[in-house]
Amino acid sequence: MQEIKETNSYRLALKDKILDAAMNAFMKYGIRAVKMDDIAQQLTISKRTLYEIYEDKEEVLYRSIIKYDRLRLERLTKYAEEGHHVIDVILEAYRIKMNEVRMVNPAFYEDILKYPKVETYIKEFSIKSKDKFLAFMQLGVEQGLLRKEVD
């Protein structure tokens, strides 16, 4: 029984490591340039192990982006909950985005269009993010930090 628990915790940790390694590689080289074999080699695991955990490259990309978005949102939420003003939180979101743009290979954004499941997720996430941003801006107006008549 102990062996099964260790195996499961190892697999869970490995799933996370795969997503981190894949996202770093995708952002650095572009999605099409990164092969599943590259990810497996980087983590010193077999391709078989990789394919036992994730069905294909699109699933790895999809899960990586979901994780990345969740972590970014958690970071901003934590920053906002630390008592920073609305303007400071907006600037932090801007800093995060600019850092991302600076670090990400432009091919990454072009390659995403070739993965329909991922493209759909990004569109849906963008809509939700925009709604949250507008609600946040409204909070800034209510606090008197932002002007209502500005678009």
Region spans (language model):
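A short secondary-structure junction motif
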Residues: L71, E100-V104, F136, G140
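N-terminal intrinsically disordered/low-complexity leader segments
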Residues: M1-A13
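Helix-turn-helix
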Residues: K17, A21, A25-E59, R63
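Hydrophobic alpha-helical connector segments
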Residues: R63, E74-M103
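Amphipathic, non-transmembrane alpha-helical scaffold segments
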Residues: R11, K15, I65, D69, ...
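Short secondary-structure transition hinges
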Residues: A93-K132
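Hydrophobic alpha-helical bundle segments that form small-molecule/ligand-binding pockets
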Residues: I127-D151
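Short coil/turn segments at alpha/beta junctions that flank glycine-rich nucleotide-binding fingerprints
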Residues: K28-R32, G83, Q143
